């Protein structure tokens, strides 16, 4: 999955951001565009392959912030026979996910999850974890995820390392041109509004070939350093099983762009 800025663009707004949409470009169009721009592709993207291996080895998987459900849909297509559950508050994204009826799709926030010891793997892929912006959102979401896991089960996710300052490339000078599923030529770009106390606020704009703006969303992502992240995990009842700075599983160092975490429920 390419993950141009915030992967799963359709569900960014669902985690607390708003957006304006032209009448000819609906929320459903935004969800479909996300799938066109970010297909789940383990053969082409190391991040997708990393998660694919974990999901295929687990008999019960909860994907928190599943968006259009591309990871779980791919797992089922590849022969996963266990329980697969996708959780997301974005209705348009879930409507697209629900085309696959042999997976459970739940419309809710992470903090609203009420499962008890039902899964042996929980995931938040494509930097979805960064949509948990406030301390309260982090605490309540981590608590709910831990409760959903069996004892000793894993919670696996990644967050961008703040030292890499990824947001500095989120600007109108970095655009993506693409043809959507309806055959429309579109241009997509992002622009940072502010960076305050580790929270980056930015807009995402989709325009037509004539330059007319079709959709604008405003989003917030939190960048946690390792020490702060680990404090939240320990408080919630997780211990770190493995930690990587890139998808080739190299340790975190001063060049790392990611904080990839495999945490275990204690």
Mark where each language-model region is.
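C-terminal lobe and adjacent flexible extensions of AdoMet/dcAdoMet transferase-like proteins
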Residues: 224-266
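A short acidic, Gly/Pro-enriched loop at the edge of an enzyme's catalytic core
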Residues: 111-121
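Class I SAM-dependent methyltransferase SAM/SAH-binding core
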Residues: 69-112
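SAM-dependent methyltransferase
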Residues: 156-230
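A short glycine-rich, Lys/Arg-flanked "PGG" loop and its adjoining helix->strand segment in the class I
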Residues: 139-151
């Amino acid at each position: 999955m390419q993950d141009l800025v915030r992967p799963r663009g359709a569900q960014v707004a669902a985690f607390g951001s708003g957006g304006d949409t032209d009448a000819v470009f609906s929320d459903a169009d935004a969800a479909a565009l996300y799938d066109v721009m970010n297909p789940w592709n383990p053969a082409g993207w190391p991040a997708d392959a990393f998660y694919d291996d974990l999901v295929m080895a687990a008999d019960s998987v909860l994907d928190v912030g599943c968006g259009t459900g591309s990871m779980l849909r791919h797992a089922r297509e590849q022969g996963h026979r266990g329980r697969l559950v996708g959780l997301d508050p974005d209705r348009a994204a879930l409507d697209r996910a629900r085309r696959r009826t042999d997976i459970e799709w739940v419309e809710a926030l992470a903090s609203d999850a009420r499962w008890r010891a039902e899964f042996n793997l929980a995931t938040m892929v494509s930097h979805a974890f960064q949509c948990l912006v406030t301390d309260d959102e982090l605490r309540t979401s981590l608590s709910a995820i831990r409760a959903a896991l069996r004892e000793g089960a894993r919670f696996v996710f990644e967050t961008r390392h703040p030292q890499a300052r990824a947001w500095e490339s989120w600007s109108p000078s970095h655009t993506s041109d693409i043809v959507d599923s309806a055959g429309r030529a579109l241009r997509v770009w992002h622009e940072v509004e502010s960076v305050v106390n580790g929270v980056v606020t930015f807009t995402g704009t989709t325009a037509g070939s004539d330059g007319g703006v079709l959709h604008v969303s405003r989003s917030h992502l939190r960048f946690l350093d390792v020490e702060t992240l680990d404090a939240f995990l320990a408080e919630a009842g997780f211990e770190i099983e493995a930690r990587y700075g890139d998808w080739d599983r190299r340790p975190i160092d001063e060049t790392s762009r990611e904080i990839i975490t495999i945490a275990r429920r204690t």
